[in-house]
Swiss-Prot record:
Compositional bias annotation for Basic residues: 11-20
Source organism, top-level taxon: Viruses
Localization per record: Virion
Keyword Magnesium: no
Name the record gives this protein: Capsid protein
Annotated segments matching region Disordered: 1-26
InterPro entries linked to this entry: Nanovirus_coat
Keyword field contains Cell division: no
GO CC annotation: T=1 icosahedral viral capsid
Record family assignment: Belongs to the nanoviridae capsid protein family.
Organism: Faba bean necrotic yellows virus (isolate Syrian SV292-88) (FBNYV)
Length: 172
């Protein structure tokens, strides 16, 4: 007869997949931190911002990030974006990334890892601004600790206003 106790000596949860006594790995408690930023981006410029939990969180591990960006721009314009992981802080965006395509330059290829990429193109009637947005849910595998850095990098073909919100799922 199977026991209903797991290895730590406490009774396990019953789930449809594990109805009785198999041990299960208890999940680490996570917390969600929401960060809201807005900026005016210049034409033909590579800019970026760091994605990290705000506040007095000293030690953490980010497991996943939900990223939402809303852009207000003229029709026919383009915004490229990258989500990158880096072991050291990036001081100059134009020194690390090429301008229209957002490729990592050769001098920085050993320290920057591309996690996700995409583009936003606007359509509409000339003379009016349109609002576009994108949502990305990024799973970070083993996670990003407080010593590593996660950035979203943007290239815009026109000056525009961007509102960036991200929800960080943190294991504390």
């Amino acid at each position: 007869m199977a026991s209903k106790w797991n290895w730590s000596g406490t009774k396990g949860r019953r789930t449809p997949r594990r109805p009785y006594g198999r041990p299960y790995k208890s999940s680490v408690p996570t917390t969600r931190v929401v960060v809201h930023q807005s900026a005016v981006l210049k034409k033909d410029e590579v800019v970026g911002t760091e994605i990290k939990p705000e506040g007095d969180v000293a030690r953490y591990k980010m497991k996943k990030v939900m990223l939402t960006c809303t852009l207000r721009m003229a029709p026919g314009e383009l915004v490229n974006y990258l989500i990158v992981k880096c072991n050291s802080p990036i001081s100059s965006w134009s020194a690390a990334f090429t301008s229209p395509a957002l490729l990592v330059k050769e001098s920085c290829q050993d320290m920057i890892t591309i996690i996700a990429k995409g583009k936003v193109e606007s359509t509409g009637v000339a003379g009016t601004d349109c609002t576009k947005s994108f949502n990305r849910f990024i799973k970070l595998g083993a996670g990003i600790t407080q010593t590593q850095h996660l950035y979203v990098v943007l290239y815009t073909s026109v000056a525009l206003k961007a509102v960036l919100e991200h929800r960080v799922y943190v294991e504390v």
